[in-house]
Amino acid sequence: MAPKNNRGKTKGDKKKKEEKVLPVIVDVIVNLPDETEAILKGISTDRIIDVRRLLSVNFDTCHVTNYSLSHEIRGSRLKDTVDVSALKPCVLTLTEEDYNEGTAVAHVRRLLDIVACTTCFGPSPEKSDSVKSAQVKGGGKNSKQSDTSPPPSPASKDTVVDEAGETSHSFPKLGSFYEFFSLAHLTPPLQYIRLATKRETEDIAKEDHLLSIDVKLCNGKLVHIEGCRKGFYSIGKQRIICHNLVDLLRQISRAFDNAYSDLLKAFSERNKFGNLPYGFRANTWLIPPTAAQSPAAFPPLPVEDERWGGDGGGQGRDGSYDLVPWSNEFAFIASMPCKTAEERQVRDRKVFLLHNLFVDVATFRAIKAVQKVMAEPVLAEEDSEVLYSETVRDLTVTVTRDTSNASSKVDTKIDGIQATGLDKKKLMERNLLKGLTADENTAAHDVATLGTISLKYCGYIAVVKLEKESEELSPPSQIVDLLEQPEGGANALNINSLRFLLHKSSPEQNKKTPQQHDDELTSSREFVSKMLEESIAKLEGEEIDRDSIMRWELGACWIQHLQDQKNTEKDKKQTGEKSKNELKVEGLGKPLKSLNSSKKKTDVSSPKTPQTALSSQVDAVSSEADTAASLQSDAEKNAQENVLILKNLLSDAAFTRLKESDTGLHHKSLQELVDLAQNYYTEVAIPKLVADFGSLELSPVDGRTLTDFMHTRGLRMRSLGYVVKLSDKLSHVQSLCVHEMIVRALKHILQAVISAVATDTDKIAIKVAAALNMMLGIPENVAATPHNPWNVHPLIFRWLEKFLKKRYDYDLNAFSYKDLRKFAILRGLCHKVGIELIPRDFDMDSPAPFRKTDVVSLVPVHKTFYFKSMQQAACSSADGRQLLESSKTALDKGKLEDAVTYGTKALAKLVAVCGPYHRMTAGAYSLLAVVLYHTGDFNQATIYQQKALDINERELGLDHPDTMKSYGDLAVFYYRLQHTELALKYVKRALYLLHLTCGPSHPNTAATYINVAMMEEGLGNVHVALRYLHKALKCNQRLLGPDHIQTAASYHAIAIALSLMEAYHLSVQHEQTTLRILRAKLGPDDLRTQDAAAWLEYFESKAFEQQEAARNGTPKPDASIASKGHLSVSDLLDYINPSHNAKGKESVAAKRKNYILKLKEKSKQSNVSEHLVEIPREKQKEMSEEDTEETGSEEGKSSEENHETILAPVEEPPSPPVIEDATMDNSNPITSSDVSTEPQHPDGSEDGWQPVQRPRSAGSYGRRMKQRRASIGKVYTYQKKNVEADIDNPLFQNATQQNDKYYILKKRTASYSSYADHHSPGLTTQGTKFGRKIVKTLAYRVKSTQPSSGNAKTAGETSEEDGLKTDASSVEPPTLSSTVQSEAYHTKNSVVSLGKSPSYKEVALAPPGSIAKYQVWVPQAEVSDKQEDDEMEKKTEQGTSMELTRDEQMITGLEEEVKKEISADPESNITQGEEEIKVELQPSEGVLGGSHINENDESGGGIQVEEQVEVELINDGVTDMIHSTREQQVIDQLAADSEDLKAKLSISTTDSGDASRGLLPNKKLSASAAPFNPSSPPSIIRPTPIGMNIGPSWPVNMTLHHGPPPPYPSPPTTPNLMQPMSFVYPPPYSQSVPTSTYPVTSGPFHPNQFPWQLNVSDFVPRTVWPGCHPVEFPPPHMITEPIAATVLEPTVILPTDIDTSGVEETKEGTQDVAVADEVMDSVNHVNNAVARSETENGNRKSEEGEKTFSILLRGRRNRKQTLRMPISLLNRPYDSQPFKLGYSRVIRDSEAPKSVA
């Protein structure tokens, strides 16, 4: 074998190199035998076993089982451990392998498994009307997704379902539990497959014949098939052999082919990314519907069907490992070297495999022993304590009867008194010392705990443990080395597969009448009542025992707390130093200061002796000092004795760890340690837990997660009552604790009932049903009384009241019965007792909700399996868990790169120890997915989360909290990938499970409500979304308080949603509440408070604008709600509950159509100068807020689909130099004071201040915002004279209506105005404005600046150049800068420099997201002229407002020319009439409205800047070809002008930086700073915040940060979806990341956008104007240096050889074209700039069609002409082909053209 190429490198070098390698997505191509290929999305860290897993969830290959993979270089039959990254190229070949009997049977089982979803999971929601209302709650499939012919208007139907479903606090429908997985509306491809007796056939050799099967197809045809080594062979007319059964049946039967194709299509529609609904196991307390139909037989799911080689998982089922020398094996592993991480990983792997094998074998032995006792009545009826015991090699199995008195509790803890044989005191000391000295090897070295299991089964308790530990260390039997982990750790032991069925299919049982069943229930109820009375009597005489045993985790948490506290004290450096001779007693902390002994107090007084010696009481002080010295000597003596005692009790290594912890605890005696630990428990541990609950750092959703959180902190469940007392302001925590106490109290009743009838198993079902009816039903003829305020059975209430008071010290009367969630109690009871029920909608309001047939079976309750196998978690990998914790911490601090690194290493360790598909690894997949999600790598995050979900569903259970969390997280990832309907399906599944577990009154549920609202708005169901938002707000108010920052976030979400509906008065009301809460909680200086203030000012400005529009008579589309003024939140329900008929899609479309027709008619009748109606500004705001990052579009999208472009938010550091972060920032300099960037969408922002509506609500108001214009970044420099030039010349009026070549330039003037101060709030007044007129269907705005005479710009003048940000959006443009209000612009004239920022007023008035963080400086020579400002405002307010409502492709704008007088002082930097403009263009693709410069060649005219025209392209079917042609010409002209301007002005950028450094910066708040969640909990858009049990001790916090963009383009966008845009903080600053809310998925939904890549042209619609041929555009050219996450803006970039093409154009052009020297200079500048950008970009795509561009030329007498030419010429020789030339003339309004022809 060839040597490794890294043998010369040191170990450290290897490590450093490995640390830098992060996982990336790779495409794995697998060549299939049918000469097709499957492209799999893998990750660079995958191995061949992962490729096999990907093939199993691929639609085309999921039926293929027996194969090998080969590589052209690595050879054939690659092992599962081969890394995919080592395969170059990553192309594999799938080779079919010969079958043996086992693999042939497994192949048949796979086919049965794939088709099981059509029959095993009950009715699908599409076909079942009875469960329509539960469809949403059950997360059932949307009919759009899974039905082959979706209904015409599913959105409206979903609206009805939603309004009646999730938001109505109704209890979940258990009958729809499995609908999420059901495809029963499809025809099953086959009816059955039966194993037949082997049939002899001549075509198959006897030794090759494996099996014979009979297959009945969907059409009723019975097919006989023989299985052989080469494949499957059909007998009959068609003798065909195929390697796999599916291909054979497809060739035999067209009906099967069609049905199977429909099934695969349904798989794809259900989830195109995978998560196929097969491979499930019956591992949930609700059994599959197919088993519920015949509970006596309990037909298994295919995976567990023993007839086809399936089983319940695990190893040792056949007894092959019973004789393993367990003691010797465990002892050997405990002695393995473990000093380094590599050694521990090897050791942990062996411990993990051995312990899992031991648990499996011990469980099987325990079940067999219990079954033996149940089968022998003599053993079962014995009165002895031990009913049965046996010894198998090293294992001892003991069976005892569970107690039949509910008040008695049997100790079944694997480390309890019964198991260890120690008394309570000794056990407490043992556990405390174990915790204090715990390290990463503790679990592996604790052989006694590893070698013990305990389970309860059918009323019996079985304990299996090692008989003795090996005294002599003999060599191991190598059993661990021979162990193989099948399927990468998947298919672990399903404890539910060991169920005991309670029903027998006897004829007598089936013949019972309903009356007989009622009699059985009555007698059983009496039996339970009698047992309850006895238990209550015994419980009343029980003494309260508060001192339970101490968990060893408490010691570990305590010492960690002491060390953290000591580190904090070191940082603060205590002011007073202790005496050298003082005995240190450290780490007690403030809560434990009272524990300091009198010795300690005396010691503390010793340092004061020198100070008091100066007094006259010298003798007294001397005696005191002597006493202190003697006491100190006694303390030192006692400490030395304590050290000796601890040394004897602990090993040398353990004592050394305790001593080196630097806490001083090694000086304490055992009793002192116990007392200190108890005080830490009461005064620190439990309050800290409650504090974590209150801050939502931890958010348990059920008893399982609550228990995990408490146990991993060493807290006993007996302390639940104390937790409730401390959680007086956390009603959801109190509810969870009370429910858990009730479940534990009722558990004892059920266990006692089962134990009492254990000898007669036929009665167990009816007795359990009767007990459940008493617990959860409403008794007949029993009314609530003061002694029984609950409407439950009196005995049940008495039991609960006594039990909770005795065991938990909690008064049940303090809890309201109406808050009782019976389904959560039922679920908890089934988990704790081991009951399996049929999935039926139980009527909890009836006296008898449960029948005998509802209770199907009993399953073992395993101490290691419950709470997600705590013991297995302990011996998985301590290093891996520590890395997970480090990843979580790095994520909290915003260090995304470190978080990814730690998470990747943690996953690698857990995969190496546990296997890639073990249940323990799923938590690491989920965490890493969350981290990658925050970096913006949504694709890779989705892959990891899908892995986690697949594992959790199959290994942990369909309702496990981790499974629930995976649903919510995956929904968020799908939403970010623009698959809204798919995301909605999964988030509703998560919501259904949340309702089942924690109910509607929980912060996680409130967060999920907002998630659903966001996705519903994405689908146009705005009213449903508002209902969810309202629910979320009320929930947060009730649970967290009206002044919680999470509640403020809810107010903000509603404010955003209302603003999208143009209900600005309501937005103002809600944002005022938001701001009030944030100011009180966070202070006015917090960024979140400032952002809320900016939002409020924006809303106020829009409300004012709306009032002005109403005063002017402009109709508002949202008058139905906005006109109502300030409504309370609850008043919204009148609007939120619309008439379903009126809000249907048909009526919406009709309204929109009528609205459009009216506008068209009005536009045609109007004159250009007369009918200029103001467009509702909020339309532009709404559409601009919908503009989010496009992640790609499907190739086949019609021209009606939106082509969205993104302008990245600007980030500027406080210092002048531009600093760009390639991984974290989307930044390009924008320096206009009026720049309007892409609006900062609240849901694409930092830390959860995200609006719920990303997409526009297309179906809500019946309008699609067809006419929108870009917000143009501009710098106004006005002269003092304001010239109003109206279009009075009839030639001009005609020119605007005919297809001529004249465009009118109007003049405007204005004066400078200074910026407001940063801290000036509420500056919402309208500034100076100027009117805009429509010129035909097209106009463009012009601003002038004066050039310096002679040279264009000198170094002295270019102190810092202003920037003009050109911006265009072909469909959904960015918002107009909010300084542009209604018909006028608020002019702010100030010199804007890179690295500076605008005023707070400027920012606050701008829509959030439209202004970036930069700074403003005002030269001293620039003095604001207030009079000029006022004059300008008066004049411009007389202008006519503008109506942008024309046809589908109307292009609007305004062209203005302002003449400036040249300053007389050539030395001044920047005069009042002059500004220098620097153009910084984002790389773009699409249509550009450009900016151009017109320089006077002889007469010295001013530079003329034409701002771009934003092209609005929304197609509704009608195309105006004439207008399109006209618009194309102007756009082409402006494109050329933009490049000219850019080339001319970008030259001075290098000189301008130094001049501005001496100016004082004035930092401003950016309204584009996405108002992020002010709270640590998720606010607006968060994944379902489910507590993740990676191990409950590793809660992972999810906060919002930015990272590098994903390397692959995203899938096509969902139509009408508004893409998110996120804000990036400057490099010197970072967002303060609060401790997050929920354990893994605590982050908000939209931390980051998925930026476009340079191949964006492959995903945008090809046709720019509807009805035209596709117009192609050149690839983007980066003018600025490339940024990783740059968002593309559509623009036409001039080609590199434009100068030569200009000459060619002159030769072929018209006589009017005159090329001036200035034009040639500008052309050369453009050439240089574009050439540089091409070099920087380095990635140009081939041009596929014709493009044209325009050049504005200026000749003699200032005649301006536009030269238009095809770009294709520029890349060919001069004589390649002829071309046509089109040009346009631009004239002033003072010039009357001679003709308009």
From Swiss-Prot:
<feature type="repeat" description="TPR 1">
    <location>
        <begin position="880"/>
        <end position="913"/>
    </location>
</feature>
<feature type="compositionally biased region" description="Polar residues">
    <location>
        <begin position="1224"/>
        <end position="1239"/>
    </location>
</feature>
<feature type="repeat" description="TPR 3">
    <location>
        <begin position="964"/>
        <end position="997"/>
    </location>
</feature>
<dbReference type="GO" id="GO:0010906">
    <property type="term" value="P:regulation of glucose metabolic process"/>
</dbReference>
<feature type="repeat" description="TPR 2">
    <location>
        <begin position="922"/>
        <end position="955"/>
    </location>
</feature>
<feature type="compositionally biased region" description="Basic and acidic residues">
    <location>
        <begin position="565"/>
        <end position="587"/>
    </location>
</feature>
<dbReference type="Pfam" id="PF15044">
    <property type="entry name" value="CLU_N"/>
</dbReference>
<feature type="region of interest" description="Disordered">
    <location>
        <begin position="565"/>
        <end position="634"/>
    </location>
</feature>
<dbReference type="GO" id="GO:0005634">
    <property type="term" value="C:nucleus"/>
</dbReference>
<dbReference type="InterPro" id="IPR027523">
    <property type="entry name" value="CLU_prot"/>
</dbReference>
<feature type="compositionally biased region" description="Polar residues">
    <location>
        <begin position="1375"/>
        <end position="1384"/>
    </location>
</feature>
<feature type="compositionally biased region" description="Basic and acidic residues">
    <location>
        <begin position="1194"/>
        <end position="1204"/>
    </location>
</feature>
<keyword id="KW-0802">TPR repeat</keyword>
<dbReference type="GO" id="GO:0019750">
    <property type="term" value="P:chloroplast localization"/>
</dbReference>
<dbReference type="InterPro" id="IPR033646">
    <property type="entry name" value="CLU-central"/>
</dbReference>
<protein>
    <recommendedName>
        <fullName>Protein REDUCED CHLOROPLAST COVERAGE 1</fullName>
    </recommendedName>
</protein>
<comment type="function">
    <text>May act as the scaffold of a protein complex, which sequesters key factors that are required for the G2 to M transition in meristematic tissues. Together with REC2, REC3 and FMT/CLU, contributes to the establishment of the cellular volume devoted to the chloroplast compartment.</text>
</comment>
<dbReference type="InterPro" id="IPR011990">
    <property type="entry name" value="TPR-like_helical_dom_sf"/>
</dbReference>
<feature type="region of interest" description="Disordered">
    <location>
        <begin position="124"/>
        <end position="164"/>
    </location>
</feature>
<dbReference type="GO" id="GO:0005829">
    <property type="term" value="C:cytosol"/>
</dbReference>
<dbReference type="GO" id="GO:0003729">
    <property type="term" value="F:mRNA binding"/>
</dbReference>
<dbReference type="InterPro" id="IPR023231">
    <property type="entry name" value="GSKIP_dom_sf"/>
</dbReference>
<feature type="compositionally biased region" description="Acidic residues">
    <location>
        <begin position="1184"/>
        <end position="1193"/>
    </location>
</feature>
<dbReference type="GO" id="GO:0005576">
    <property type="term" value="C:extracellular region"/>
</dbReference>
<feature type="domain" description="Clu">
    <location>
        <begin position="304"/>
        <end position="573"/>
    </location>
</feature>
<feature type="compositionally biased region" description="Basic and acidic residues">
    <location>
        <begin position="1171"/>
        <end position="1183"/>
    </location>
</feature>
<keyword id="KW-0677">Repeat</keyword>
<feature type="compositionally biased region" description="Polar residues">
    <location>
        <begin position="604"/>
        <end position="620"/>
    </location>
</feature>
<keyword id="KW-0539">Nucleus</keyword>
<feature type="region of interest" description="Disordered">
    <location>
        <begin position="1166"/>
        <end position="1273"/>
    </location>
</feature>
<dbReference type="Pfam" id="PF13424">
    <property type="entry name" value="TPR_12"/>
</dbReference>
<feature type="region of interest" description="Disordered">
    <location>
        <begin position="1423"/>
        <end position="1442"/>
    </location>
</feature>
<dbReference type="Pfam" id="PF12807">
    <property type="entry name" value="eIF3_p135"/>
</dbReference>
<feature type="compositionally biased region" description="Low complexity">
    <location>
        <begin position="588"/>
        <end position="597"/>
    </location>
</feature>
<feature type="repeat" description="TPR 4">
    <location>
        <begin position="1006"/>
        <end position="1039"/>
    </location>
</feature>
<feature type="short sequence motif" description="Nuclear localization signal">
    <location>
        <begin position="805"/>
        <end position="812"/>
    </location>
</feature>
<dbReference type="InterPro" id="IPR028275">
    <property type="entry name" value="CLU_N"/>
</dbReference>
<feature type="compositionally biased region" description="Polar residues">
    <location>
        <begin position="1343"/>
        <end position="1352"/>
    </location>
</feature>
<dbReference type="InterPro" id="IPR019734">
    <property type="entry name" value="TPR_rpt"/>
</dbReference>
<keyword id="KW-0963">Cytoplasm</keyword>
<dbReference type="InterPro" id="IPR025697">
    <property type="entry name" value="CLU_dom"/>
</dbReference>
<feature type="repeat" description="TPR 5">
    <location>
        <begin position="1048"/>
        <end position="1081"/>
    </location>
</feature>
